[in-house]
Amino acid sequence: MMDNMQTEAQPTRTRILNAAREIFSENGFHSASMKAICKSCAISPGTLYHHFISKEALIQAIILQDQERALARFREPIEGIHFVDYMVESIVSLTHEAFGQRALVVEIMAEGMRNPQVAAMLKNKHMTITEFVAQRMRDAQQKGEISPDINTAMTSRLLLDLTYGVLADIEAEDLAREASFAQGLRAMIGGILTAS
């Protein structure tokens, strides 16, 4: 019986999260209502609150989904490609994400500036991601791809900040079509990571 309940609950939870993503990215966090989310995914308020007790709980789930997507890039050692090239490709790939998804990331970051609860969620997300990026940087140091003198913890955070800057740039997708975009990223990231 429990397996059947979990199977039924997952699609509802996913529908709620998808609706929340869309509504938050279109209307902003404060203008979005739980009622609009219910209407968008055709569920009752009771069903919504069964899965998520507040907007902050929805944001937490979205943050964790986004964190998992980021970790998928850095969880395993990077093989067959230089670390700098991997970072450039990863950042360029973000410019192809749906504009609504990119807007949602910026909206959540802005909410983190106002709301200490969301700020704590983002801090945890950033710490988790940068720990994995720092590990991949240490791997690259061992291979001699980047300078052994780099502070991997701080540099991984700066690379994350660069990534968020690209996500927030409304022209990033158009700019990324130009070869000079990847070339500039490669020069910037390579300069930081290979400087002695």
From Swiss-Prot:
InterPro entries: DNA-bd_HTH_TetR-type_CS, Homeodomain-like_sf, HTH-type_TetR-like_transc_reg, HTH_TetR, Tet_transcr_reg_TetR-rel_C_sf
Residue ranges occupied by any HTH tetR-type domain in the UniProt entry: 10-70
BP terms from Gene Ontology: DNA-templated transcription; negative regulation of DNA-templated transcription; regulation of DNA-templated transcription
Domain of life: Bacteria
UniProt keywords, alphabetically: DNA-binding, Repressor, Transcription, Transcription regulation
UniProt KW Transcription keyword: yes
Job of this protein: Repressor for the uidRABC (gusRABC) operon.
Name of the protein in its database record: HTH-type transcriptional regulator UidR
Native species: Escherichia coli (strain K12)
